[in-house]
Regions:
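Short solvent-exposed loop/turn micro-motifs enriched in small/polar/acidic residues
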Residues: 26, 33-35, 57-58, 81-82
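Extracellular beta-rich ligand/substrate-recognition surface
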Residues: 51-55
Length: 112
């Protein structure tokens, strides 16, 4: 094996390790997150939304977690039985953000 092949193999291994280190998993999103307007609690099958204005909490059924590099797309059933999805990303040091979509704003969260 020549030096160029070894260098290429080491580089490919480094890239793969870096991608794996950034991979998002359930442990990254599980548990309670606090935001400006709501707090979220992620469990394997449910998302609980707690409002800061004393409205009753909403509990939604999660049908699927889709993990990508530094994001999680959650498919869930809303209050009228329609499936919706929400993307959470920017995981770093106990922080994350619900990504904006259409008329819905980006919402930052931190671990409670």
């Amino acid at each position: 094996m020549n030096k160029q092949t070894v260098a290429l193999a080491l580089f490919a291994g480094w890239i793969l390790a870096a991608e794996m280190a950034n991979a998002t998993t359930y442990k990254d999103i599980a548990g309670q997150w606090c935001g400006d307007v709501t707090d979220y609690v992620f469990a394997p099958d449910t998302l609980t939304v707690k409002f800061h204005d004393n409205r009753p909490a909403n509990v939604f059924k999660i049908t699927k977690y889709n993990y990508a590099n530094n994001s999680v797309r959650i498919n869930w059933i809303n209050g009228v039985g329609k499936e919706s999805d929400t993307v959470f990303a920017e995981f770093s040091g106990g922080k994350m953000a619900q990504q904006g979509s259409g008329d819905k704003p980006r919402r930052p969260f931190h671990r409670c």
